[in-house]
From Swiss-Prot:
Protein name: Elongation factor Tu, chloroplastic
Pfam families associated with the record: GTP_EFTU, GTP_EFTU_D2, GTP_EFTU_D3
UniProt-annotated stretches for the region G2: 60-64
Record-annotated tr-type G domain positions: 10-214
Length: 410
């Protein structure tokens, strides 16, 4: 008898490994893919396949990122791992690979190191909502008490950065020993090998602790306006890609940005590829016909949104990465009062950089190419801004930096 085809539609979650250099992020990534390949029949990835990460471009910045995918019984995961520390910083700030949760890898032999803390801080600021900890290199720690001390230190560090350090799941193990066992015998199943079982228990915690993200279509409607034209006898059409949510004919929307106050209108028609629609959803490239709006009232850079869900702002705090010379960025430092363009969604808005702060909160006077810095920005026009929003910093049309908003000031 032919076997029935077994299909499953599992919820999808994006995660990544973060942590200090050489604490075992890539080894763990390889061990997870190999262990789950054994149980779900997918393809495992070797360390060297993940380590040779291809270059990608996001917001004008080149980043090396490795993407792997795997499945547990409950979910499908897309997992991002970066080879170098600078790639992590760039990846998290540009949002090139959005993370719904992260596995923080800490060597049990060393405990939290400077980059451990930097990655936790970045995760908090760029809005990675949940973290699960893997205490790696357990085989190198002879004393169980030492491992407990490291675990306490990791929990305290997480609490320092406003993660719930007492609740975060912590799993100890050895990614290397698990990977070596799986390389010798790729068919190891649960219960056959102590080290491989620790990888399974880590993924059980990830399954249980990191919530399934809200789907884009369930969020409130937002579309950045890319182009505007008028249709004689019918009115004004704004086109763009629906960033999130859904919109139906007859619904009220707000036009936000580049003016002090939002304007409300009614959607009288939706068009996609010359066909009319009743409803448009996240991901659609669509033309939205708006009642009672003149062509001069709306322009590229504004957004259409569900009323009351997003407001225009001029001032915000952001975490920013400034490109170095080799990456095509500036060759010279810049100072407070620097006025570049901030490219947000679909448009450039000039802004003035009011102040800079280092990670420890100390003020700095100048920023060098290649630095990561916190800054306060004052835009000359209000635009629709929200926490977690990404932007590029440009100067004469070329990208000199990338940032993420973590606080709105007015």
């Amino acid at each position: 008898m032919a076997r029935e085809k077994f299909e499953r539609k599992k919820p999808h979650v994006n995660i990544g490994t973060i942590g200090h250099v050489d604490h075992g992020k890539t080894t763990l990534t390889a061990a997870i893919t190999m262990a789950l390949a054994a149980s779900t029949g997918a393809k495992g990835k070797r360390y060297d396949e993940i380590d040779a990460a291809p270059e990608e471009r996001a917001r004008g910045i080149t980043i090396n990122t490795a993407h792997v995918e795997y499945e547990t019984e409950k979910r499908h995961y897309a997992h991002v791992d970066c080879p170098g520390h600078a790639d992590y910083v760039k990846n998290m700030i540009t949002g090139a690979a959005q993370m719904d949760g992260a596995i923080l890898v800490v060597s049990g032999a060393d405990g939290p190191m400077p980059q451990t803390k930097e990655h936790i801080l970045l995760a908090k600021q760029v809005g990675v909502p949940n973290v699960v900890v893997f205490l790696n290199k357990e085989d190198q720690v002879d004393d169980a008490e030492l491992l407990e001390l490291v675990e306490l230190e990791v929990r305290e560090t997480l609490s320092d950065y406003d993660f719930p350090g007492d609740e975060v799941p912590v799993v100890a193990g050895s990614a290397l020993l698990a990977l070596e066992s799986l390389t010798q015998n790729p068919k190891i199943v649960k219960g056959e090998n102590k080290w491989v079982d620790k990888i399974y228990s880590l993924m059980d915690q990830v399954d249980a602790y990191i919530p399934t993200p809200e789907r884009d279509t369930d969020k409130p409607f937002l579309m950045a306006v890319e182009d505007v034209f008028s249709i004689t006898g019918r009115g004004t059409v704004a086109t763009g890609r629906v960033e999130r949510g859904t919109v139906k004919v007859g619904e009220a929307i707000e036009i936000v940005g580049l003016r002090e106050a939002p304007v409300t209108s009614i959607v009288t028609g939706l068009e996609m590829f010359q066909k009319t629609l009743e409803e448009s959803v996240a991901g659609d490239n669509v033309g939205i016909l708006l009642r009672g709006i003149q062509k001069k009232d709306i322009e590229r850079g504004m957004v259409l949104a569900k009323p009351g869900t997003i407001k225009p702002h001029k001032s915000f705090e952001a975490q920013v990465y400034i490109l170095n010379k080799e990456e095509g960025g500036r060759h010279t430092p810049f100072f407070q009062g620097y006025r570049p363009q901030f490219y947000v969604r679909t448009t450039d808005v000039t802004g003035k950089i009011e102040s800079f702060q280092a990670d420890d909160g100390s003020e700095t006077q100048m920023v060098m190419p290649g630095d990561r810095i916190k800054m306060v920005v004052q835009l000359i026009q209000p635009i629709a801004i929200e926490k977690g929003m990404r932007f590029a910093i440009r100067e004469g049309g070329r990208t000199v930096g990338a940032g993420v908003v973590f606080n709105i000031l007015e």
